[in-house]
Amino acid sequence: MILVLGVFKIEVEPMLKEMEVLEKGRLLKRYYQRGVVGRNEVVVSYGFIGKVEAALVTQAFLDRFNIDAVFLTGNAGGLEGVEVGDVVIGDSYVEYDFETALGDEGIIVSGSEDLEDKVIAYSNREIKTGLIASGDAFVTVKEKAEEIKRRTGALCVDMDSAAVAKVCYENEKKFLAIKTIVDICGRETEEEFRKNYERYGFLSNLILLDVLKKCVF
């Protein structure tokens, strides 16, 4: 079974609308649908902000259902090397605001090469792969974005991927984040962000939906 998560409803809406629904329910007050996409059994849910909630929700679904792989679809802020509308797959994940004695790079969790290869092979869209950095704040200042880029080499930032990756690592589950760039950190205005979010908010999930129709995970 596959678990598909998004922060907000728009980020999983294509799959909610098109899946063959077998069950509807709530877990930790979050709405979910269980059903079939292609030949894959899928559970889809949304509704969390920040690393703590992302980890909490992920673990709850891993405990409730017999999950083999987890996908996180949604949006991210771009760093140097990407532009608005680009789709990024995480091949690794790091918490940029997690201070340790291990050095500036922090603790990096690798993504699933198997999931990555299948999504790239069956998607009809150009996809970038690289490190996704997560933290519990919006990165709106250019200098902060440049610092994160320098320390981590990340393509983009969000508030959840690294947390979900860590939970999946500890539970020995495959994980992949698919994120669409909706703004460039330190460059876009709030108005531009909202416009881009309306345009691209569902794109990552739409890509995964198309892949699941073609491929068995």
Curated annotation (Swiss-Prot):
GO BP: any one term: nucleoside catabolic process
Active-site residue list: 11 (proton acceptor), 183 (proton donor)
Keyword tags: Amino-acid biosynthesis, Hydrolase, Methionine biosynthesis
Alphabetized CDD domains for the sequence: MTAN (cd09008)
Entries under Pfam families matching the protein: PNP_UDP_1 (PF01048)
Top-level taxon of the source organism: Bacteria
GO molecular function terms noted in the UniProt entry: adenosylhomocysteine nucleosidase activity; methylthioadenosine nucleosidase activity
Residues annotated as binding substrate: 77, 139, 159-160
E.C. number(s) listed in UniProt: 3.2.2.9
Family classification: Belongs to the PNP/UDP phosphorylase family. MtnN subfamily.
Cellular-component GO terms for this entry: cytosol
Official protein name in the record: 5'-methylthioadenosine/S-adenosylhomocysteine nucleosidase
Recorded metabolic or biological pathway in which this protein acts: Amino-acid biosynthesis; L-methionine biosynthesis via salvage pathway; S-methyl-5-thio-alpha-D-ribose 1-phosphate from S-methyl-5'-thioadenosine (hydrolase route): step 1/2
Catalytic activity reported: S-adenosyl-L-homocysteine + H2O = S-(5-deoxy-D-ribos-5-yl)-L-homocysteine + adenine; S-methyl-5'-thioadenosine + H2O = 5-(methylsulfanyl)-D-ribose + adenine; 5'-deoxyadenosine + H2O = 5-deoxy-D-ribose + adenine
TM stretches of this protein: none
UniProt cross-references to Gene3D superfamilies, sorted A to Z: Nucleoside phosphorylase domain
Function text: Catalyzes the irreversible cleavage of the glycosidic bond in both 5'-methylthioadenosine (MTA) and S-adenosylhomocysteine (SAH/AdoHcy) to adenine and the corresponding thioribose, 5'-methylthioribose and S-ribosylhomocysteine, respectively. Also cleaves 5'-deoxyadenosine, a toxic by-product of radical S-adenosylmethionine (SAM) enzymes, into 5-deoxyribose and adenine.
